[in-house]
Regions:
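Noncatalytic regulatory segments and standalone regulatory/sensor domains
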Residues: 118-173
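Extracytoplasmic/secreted envelope proteins and their assembly/folding machinery
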Residues: 21, 25-33, 43-47, 63-70, ...
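Ordered hydrophobic segments in well-structured contexts
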Residues: 3, 96-98, 112-114, 156-162
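Active-site-adjacent structural segments surrounding the nucleophilic cysteine of cysteine proteases
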Residues: 1-55, 138, 165, 170-173
Length: 173
């Protein structure tokens, strides 16, 4: 089971970092870090670290923040570009995939979220850190890739995992 954080929750928004408006990258990484490590790492933890390292401002996160946060919290990060097969394989192995979305279902501008699972029809479940409602549906992986935004640092899709085999509770199903 994936831990879900929403960037709009009041608990994160007295920090002064503008998480509600621009904290989707660090919030997405808080989902991955907390899920994979079993440690309670909140959006405030990831945003403050990214800010201190120069990866985050009130305008949002730099793309290189994703691999940097993974490394800081002891995780691995593989940039997948927009490679359909690599994204699918990562999800099949229980590895969450952080995605940077462009205009479409999820945003009008740019928005980070997490792909958490894929079914036999190649529909993905998402942890959209900006919308609990959008997190309740499945989306065609093809559509998600087609709505991604051009990104640097190996993006717009990044596989996040532990050294060795990623193990989430999905592996025991």
């Amino acid at each position: 089971k994936f831990i879900y954080f929403n960037q709009g929750d009041a608990a994160w928004n007295s920090s002064g970092y503008g998480i509600r408006a621009a904290g989707c990258g660090p919030t997405s990484m808080a989902v991955c870090i907390s899920t994979l490590t079993g440690k309670w790492v909140t959006p405030v933890d990831t945003t403050s670290w990214a800010y201190e390292q120069g990866y985050y401002s009130s305008a949002g996160s730099e793309h290189r923040a994703i691999p940097a946060m993974a490394e800081h919290w002891g995780l691995k990060c593989d940039g997948l570009g927009t490679n359909y097969q690599k994204i699918k394989e990562s999800l099949k192995h229980g590895r969450p995939v952080v995605s940077l979305m462009g205009s479409g279902y999820f945003t009008r501008g740019g928005h980070f979220m997490v792909l958490t699972e894929i079914d036999s029809n190649d529909n993905v479940t998402v942890a959209d850190v900006g919308s609990r409602k959008r997190s309740q549906y499945k989306y065609s992986l093809h559509d998600v890739i087609s709505q991604s935004k051009v990104a640097s640092a190996g993006g717009p899709f990044w596989s996040i995992y532990k050294q060795g085999k990623a193990k989430t509770q999905n592996d025991s199903k």
